[in-house]
């Protein structure tokens, strides 16, 4: 499903609905995914395989591969929000929402959700090298992630650590750069207290920016600005979040057209305290057991 979105959102527990206007198109897709386009026309990815050339034996020759679908989407000037319709994603979101979920279970759930979202976000985005090697039984065509192309994960502390916990098991040879951004609970403005980003990211880097909750948008906007200042284009960044809300998505769309956001779910609103409703509470406190009380 692909949808073009107007200026306002309204979501239900069963189906994402958007107001005031909505245009949807559906097509047969081997890897179905729901994604929402902040533009007037819908866009839907297709798996269009790339043809392979003959390979010499016992060698691995570098050839960057990217499916035509991903290339065409990246070439567009639209911000897309992907909500993968995977039953495990729905399961872990449900575990996270439950106020009775204890801290260890919550942290495991958010880590498993992060693994699934990174898997979906890396689909057809990571460059590969193809070639032929010898298996114990004879020659075999192979395809590996290209080790020359830098892959980085940037978790926003604290809760981003939990969501990115399984990044290394999904993404080969990735680097992790920590970024600490806190939010003033009165003004809701972000403040950077830890910055372990490089002065400049290597050329052709692909970066996964991980923040569990996109509510008012202050934290993710500050993080995006820091990445852009260090030489990254919007096409080199993918945002991973457990849950998102319209205020944050609208701000990202306005300033960073072309950005791709992968979310477990989109909720309809943010309250006056800056929390998503119904949301999942404070992801950092619930991940690390530091929540002493909760005022709804």
Swiss-Prot record:
Positions bound to GTP = 148-151
State its role: Uracil phosphoribosyltransferase (UPRT) that catalyzes the conversion of uracil and 5-phospho-alpha-D-ribose 1-diphosphate (PRPP) to UMP and diphosphate. Is probably the only functional UPRT, since the dual-domain proteins of the UKL family seem to lack this activity.
* Catalyzed reactions per annotation: UMP + diphosphate = 5-phospho-alpha-D-ribose 1-diphosphate + uracil
Note on how the cofactor is bound? Binds 1 Mg(2+) ion per subunit. The magnesium is bound as Mg-PRPP.
Domain remark from Swiss-Prot or TrEMBL: The N-terminal sequence (1-125) is sufficient to address heterologous proteins to chloroplasts.
Q: Which UniProt keywords apply?
A: Acetylation, Allosteric enzyme, Chloroplast, Glycosyltransferase, GTP-binding, Nucleotide-binding, Plastid, Transferase, Transit peptide
What the record says about activity regulation is:
Allosterically activated by GTP.
Q: What is this protein called?
A: Uracil phosphoribosyltransferase, chloroplastic
Q: What induces it?
A: Up-regulated when pyrimidine catabolism is impaired.
Query: Which residues bind uracil per the record?
Result: 281-283
Where, by residue number, does 5-phospho-alpha-D-ribose 1-diphosphate bind? 158, 183, 211, 216-219, 282
Entry superkingdom: Eukaryota
Listed InterPro entries: PRibTrfase_dom (IPR000836), PRTase-like (IPR029057), UPRTase/APRTase (IPR050054), Ura_phspho_trans (IPR005765)
Organism source for this protein? Arabidopsis thaliana (Mouse-ear cress)
Q: Where in the cell is the protein located?
A: Plastid, Chloroplast
